[in-house]
Amino acid sequence: LVIETIENIATKLSISISFKTDVTQTLIDITEIDLNAQDKILIRNTNAVINIKSKVGLTPLHLATLQNNLSVSKGAYLNDGDANGMTPLHYAAMTGNLEMVDFLKWTPLHLAILFKQLVIELLAKTFFDLAIENGRLNIVAFAVEKYIAAR
């Protein structure tokens, strides 16, 4: 009954769903999915896996970051990169989303990525570089302030 309900909701929302055999975890294949539809699926199905990835490596947190939506963040891996290695923090910096940048925490890994220290990057550019290129001076100032405070 749970699987049928989820399948019906998914069909109405044009979402592709696949299931594991043990039904304790439901895998949602995110193709091009409306975030509000994603929230509805996650709310209705508490067994949904939050750290799954689309074919291009996007997680629900990547999509949530693009829409300044913190509702799908609980239990999500903050450092998961997409197919190009871009984390939700990269996306938040590119879009100038200071609230999401602050929410995504300043872990030692993010500080290392910020200044290209001790990290082999999958991308030639860090989220800091992307913020500069996109004229997101609020993100640049915030990042520098956090870096100085962490020293």
Swiss-Prot record:
Iso and Leu residues are assigned by comparison with orthologs. PANTHER family: ANKYRIN REPEAT-CONTAINING, PROTEIN HOS4. Disulfide bonds: none annotated. Belongs to the cationic peptide 01 (latrotoxin) family. 02 (alpha-latroinsectotoxin) subfamily. Expressed by the venom gland. This is Alpha-latroinsectotoxin-Lh1a. Its main location: secreted. The keyword Nucleus does not apply. GO terms for cellular component: extracellular region; host cell presynaptic membrane; membrane; other organism cell membrane. It comes from Latrodectus hasselti (Redback spider). Keywords: ANK repeat, Cleavage on pair of basic residues, Exocytosis, Membrane, Neurotoxin, Presynaptic neurotoxin, Repeat, Secreted, Target cell membrane, Target membrane, Toxin, Transmembrane. It comes from the Eukaryota. The lineage of its organism: Eukaryota, Metazoa, Ecdysozoa, Arthropoda, Chelicerata. It holds the Pfam family Ank_2. Homotetramer in membranes. ANK repeats lie at residues 21-37, 41-52, 56-80, 84-104, 105-116, 117-125, 126-146, 147-151. Insecticidal presynaptic neurotoxin that induces massive neurotransmitter release at insect (but not vertebrate) neuromuscular junctions. Native toxin forms cation-permeable pores (with high permeability to calcium) in lipid membranes locust muscle membrane and artificial lipid bilayers. May bind to insect neurexin-1 homolog, insect adhesion G protein-coupled receptor L1 homolog, and insect receptor-type tyrosine-protein phosphatase S homolog, and induces neurotransmitter exocytosis both by forming tetrameric pores in membranes and signaling via G protein-coupled receptor. The H8 helix is predicted to insert into membranes and form pores by assembling into tetramers. The helix is contained within a helical bundle domain that undergoes significant conformational changes during pore formation to allow exposure of the H8 transmembrane helix and transition of the toxin from a soluble monomer to a transmembrane tetramer.
